[in-house]
A protein has these predicted regions:
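ATP-dependent carboxylate activation and anion-phosphoryl transfer catalytic cores
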Residues: 8, 17, 21, 44-47, ...
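A conserved helix-loop-beta module that forms one wall/lid of the active-site cleft
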Residues: 1-61
Length: 253
């Protein structure tokens, strides 16, 4: 439902949901002025990830490492006011990012379609990172946490259909949730091919009233092969473009 999208994108509502579910997320804050952004960043500690609220494709997202960088970002990249807040989050150094696609029906059943491990480190936009399914380096205990949290978030948001959730795992194995997108994501075609199930078709059926049992999709598929997705980057067409990958999406496929 539309309210699920708002709950996932509105920082105050999202933080309240995660606290209610006892799910970890990186320390963060909401800033409606330059002064508030500086206070939030110094309370959290640099480096921080900054971005506008309600954004797609990582537009205007940046990792900043000092007050000077943050002031430059606010002056040149975004317009900050009470109606257009900026989100300030702790950047997790040396973390591994994971994408999870899951399917939910109206009866509250949730099945994970795939857990993808990013090859590039967390901080590179998920659309620019290569990834593998299944995960290759994440511990079973961290994966168990992801498998526990994913249905909790999907049910709490009231999702019927597909949901994408992004996680980060730091070197000691602690899992943090980065964001949830209560919709079909760009990874759905890749996961569907990897596991051999037409996820978009399944999502259409459950949105029309079918249950996961009706379509015989009731448990996570265990793969005996590895599938890899690589991004298509257009730097040969744009020779002047900065080739350093970051939180703002660069790939075209």
């Amino acid at each position: 439902p539309p309210d699920s999208i708002d709950a996932a994108e509105d920082r105050e509502r999202w933080q309240a949901i995660l606290e209610e579910l006892d799910i970890l997320q990186p320390p963060g804050g909401v800033a409606r002025s330059e002064a508030e952004a500086l206070v939030a960043a110094n309370n959290i500690g640099y480096p921080v990830m900054v971005r506008p609220s309600f954004v797609l494709g990582g537009r205007a997202m940046e990792i900043v490492s000092s007050d000077a960088d943050l002031k430059r970002y606010i002056t040149t990249a975004v317009e900050v006011d009470p109606e257009k807040p900026v989100l300030v989050d702790k950047y997790l150094n040396n973390a591994t990012e994971l994408d999870v696609d899951a399917l939910c029906d109206a009866e509250g059943n949730v099945v994970i379609a795939g857990i993808m491990e990013h090859i590039e480190q967390a901080g590179v936009h998920s659309g620019d990172s290569a990834c593998s399914i299944p995960s290759q380096t994440i511990s079973e205990s961290s994966l168990a946490t992801i498998r526990e949290w994913t249905p909790k978030v999907a049910k709490r948001l009231g999702v019927i259909g597909l949901i994408n959730i992004q996680y980060a795992v730091i070197p000691d194995g602690t899992v943090y949730i980065i964001e949830a997108n209560p919709r079909a994501s760009r990874t759905v075609p890749f996961v569907a091919k990897a596991i051999g199930h037409p996820l978009a078709k399944y999502a259409s059926l459950v949105m029309a009233g079918a249950t996961l049992a009706d379509i015989n999709f009731t448990e996570e598929v265990k793969l005996n092969h590895v599938a890899v997705k690589e991004a298509v980057l257009p730097f040969d067409k744009f020779p002047g473009a900065d080739t350093l990958l970051g939180p703002e999406m660069r790939s075209t496929g």
